[in-house]
């Protein structure tokens, strides 16, 4: 028994969960390097496509994280993305200004987030019902106002980051992308720091986990929730803008 306890103590300092993640990462890296050695151009193309197709999923997930951490269940992310994609597309058709189209998409997501927050916080509507309302509303609006035969003025282009884009394998994947892809990568890092290493993040998590306790120590629960849902809406709007400004470059009903 004593020897067993000593052995357990000997290895107790090792974070086995981290070890498993590192081993899995090394295995994946080994597979990638193997295929890269055989067909480097094809491997880079596949990894680049994988990253770009993941962008709306990343941004949608971040939207959900910001809402959930504040105690709001947001199942209206798809509706926020849909309406943002539509208005970004129409702005691009009417003006040809890609930056304005991107801002319109983000603003649309923010407004839809504010609407969800109003339903859930002010009116105390069931959050699942509120998200369903947004999804149905977005589907109805885009289906009614959509017109066929419209053409956009182009898509967002790749921005290579100098010498970094020439690094074998990872250069074309990470450092030669359109702007929204870069923004999505940076937002993942920024969100991690914001939620777990700032006072605002601590308050957000407190509001989501125990709102009464947070209110007792003077945290404005409603304000935190409003801001988080709006910020999440901006990210959903960015995801929608990606679909029509950087991804497929067009819009279809639904």
Predicted regions, residues:
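Inter-helical junctions in multi-pass inner-membrane proteins, predominant
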Residues: 38-49, 147, 195, 232-254
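Membrane-interfacial amphipathic/re-entrant helices at transmembrane-helix boundaries
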Residues: 2-59, 87, 99-100
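Small-residue faces within membrane-embedded alpha-helices
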Residues: 50, 54-61, 82, 105, ...
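Hydrophobic core segments of alpha-helical transmembrane domains in multi-pass membrane transport
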Residues: 20-34, 60, 139-143, 183-192, ...
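Transmembrane helix-bundle core of multi-pass membrane transporters
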Residues: 138-197, 226-227, 247-254
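Short loop segments and helix-boundary regions at transmembrane helix junctions
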Residues: 10-15, 69-73, 112-167, 197-199
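Single transmembrane alpha-helix segments in multi-pass membrane proteins
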Residues: 45-95, 102, 111-128
């Amino acid at each position: 028994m004593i020897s067993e306890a000593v052995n357990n103590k000997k290895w107790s300092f090792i974070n086995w969960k981290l070890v498993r993640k590192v081993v899995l990462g090394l295995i994946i890296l080994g597979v990638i390097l193997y295929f890269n050695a055989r067909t480097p151009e094809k491997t880079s193309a596949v990894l680049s496509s994988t990253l770009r197709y993941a962008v709306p999923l990343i941004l949608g997930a971040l939207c959900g994280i910001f809402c959930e951490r504040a105690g709001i269940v947001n199942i209206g992310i798809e509706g926020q993305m849909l309406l943002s994609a539509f208005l970004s597309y129409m702005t691009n058709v009417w003006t040809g200004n890609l930056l304005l189209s991107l801002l319109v998409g983000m603003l649309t997501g923010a407004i839809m987030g504010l609407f969800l927050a109003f339903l859930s916080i002010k009116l105390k509507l069931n959050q699942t019902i509120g998200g369903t309302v947004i999804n149905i509303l977005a589907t109805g609006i885009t289906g009614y106002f959509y017109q066929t035969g419209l053409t956009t003025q182009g898509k967002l282009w790749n921005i290579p980051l100098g010498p970094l884009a020439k690094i074998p394998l990872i250069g074309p994947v990470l450092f030669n992308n359109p702007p929204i892809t870069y923004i999505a990568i940076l937002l993942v890092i920024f969100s991690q720091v914001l939620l777990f290493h700032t006072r605002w993040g601590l308050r957000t998590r407190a509001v989501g986990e125990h709102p009464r306790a947070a209110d007792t120590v003077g945290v404005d629960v409603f304000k935190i929730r409003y801001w988080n849902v709006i910020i999440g809406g901006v990210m959903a709007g960015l995801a929608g803008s990606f679909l029509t400004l950087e991804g497929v470059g067009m819009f279809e009903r639904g």
